[in-house]
Amino acid sequence: GMKMHVATDDIIGIVTNAVYGPANEHDISRARELIPSETEQVYGDAGYVGMGKREEFQTDKEAEKRSYRINLRPGVLKGRSAEDLIRKIEHFKSSVRCKVEHVFARVKLQMSYRKTRYRGIAKNAHRINTMLALCNLFTFDCYLKRLMA
């Protein structure tokens, strides 16, 4: 199997970086390759908890300027009410992070990419890179249409 890790722009939602790896690898192990050193804000799901404490992120010269906004695990929010401040903060983080999920939805639903076709990550990565480039064109076109309306 194969996993795709994607970094997107937080305003438009276009893909800025994509990293591929085996499916049995943890999400946080590919985070250093995914996030450039000049990034100021990092949003991620619960699989990236503790990313800011890892050694490879603390050695950057921009590390003190970077803020990590990682969603909590679902079990932490289980007993809280809907009006709770922590739940509202998590909702805001998720609303920014959903731009990545839109990329995955576009690749899977519009471009019908559900299974890896080739043997090896490199061949599948070339195919997905082409799909992500098309996805960026679609996303930017939608963004321009929203601006013009």
Residue ranges of predicted features:
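Short, residue-level hotspots on alpha-helical faces of the histone-fold
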Residues: 102, 106, 131-136
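Polybasic low-complexity intrinsically disordered regions
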Residues: 1-59, 129-135, 143
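Intrinsically disordered, low-complexity and often Lys/Arg-enriched segments
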Residues: 145-149
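Helix-centered, glycine/charged polyanion-binding patches within enzymatic domains
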Residues: 40-41, 46-122, 126
